[in-house]
């Protein structure tokens, strides 16, 4: 049995100490890291509860419940940040990526503790694939919110649309992972390739300007 709340405390403790030492300018980064790990912890409990209530099998829990719960939970601290602090557009995407990255980090650590770390090649691909998938979802949501929240009429519809896009991408990834075999490694490679293609496109556009 994996006591993920104990893992959470161990990972968050040094972040809290670092946040106190680094000063106010860096405080936002550490708070978003802690928020990302916190919503990952809560997502695990909610996923388990909903799977039990709905009597879902492993495939249904992985492909139908987990993507919806996890993407909604990752959105909550971001929406709180937007509503309370009303940040400028250029601060929204880094916040979303930080939450997504810390979510993926905590998820990977829990996976390693539960399943072992003896298969290096599998762990290597899973680490990059899962991390890139969560970061890609963070890029979609964060980049989109930076645009939609500057326009009042787009806030609600835009947020729902971006959440739906992130859930769909997450569900496709989880479905390929659950299928196994070659599809599993395609799933690991796909987010990495999409992130790389996006960065390359952004670099080319910046050079043209």
Provide a role label for each language-model segment.
Residues 1-209:
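Hydrophobic alpha-helical segments at protein termini of multi-pass membrane proteins
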């Amino acid at each position: 049995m994996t006591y993920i709340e104990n893992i959470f405390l161990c990972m968050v403790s040094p972040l809290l100490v670092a946040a106190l030492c680094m000063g106010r300018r860096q405080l936002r980064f550490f708070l978003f890291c802690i928020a990302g790990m916190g919503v990952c912890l809560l997502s695990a409990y909610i996923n388990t509860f909903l799977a039990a209530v709905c009597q879902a099998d492993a495939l249904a829990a992985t492909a139908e419940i987990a993507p919806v719960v996890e993407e909604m939970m990752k959105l909550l601290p971001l929406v709180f940040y937007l509503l309370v602090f009303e940040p400028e557009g250029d601060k929204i995407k880094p916040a979303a990526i930080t939450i997504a990255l810390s979510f993926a980090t905590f998820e990977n650590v829990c996976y390693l503790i539960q399943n072992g770390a003896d298969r290096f090649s599998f762990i290597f691909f899973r680490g990059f694939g899962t991390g890139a998938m969560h970061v890609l979802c963070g890029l979609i949501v964060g980049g989109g919110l930076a645009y939609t929240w500057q326009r009042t009429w787009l806030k609600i519809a835009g947020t729902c649309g971006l959440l739906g896009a992130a859930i769909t991408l997450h569900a496709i990834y989880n479905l390929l992972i659950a299928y196994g075999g070659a599809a599993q490694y395609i799933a690991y490679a796909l987010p990495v390739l999409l992130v790389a293609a996006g960065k390359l496109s952004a670099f080319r556009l910046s050079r043209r300007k």
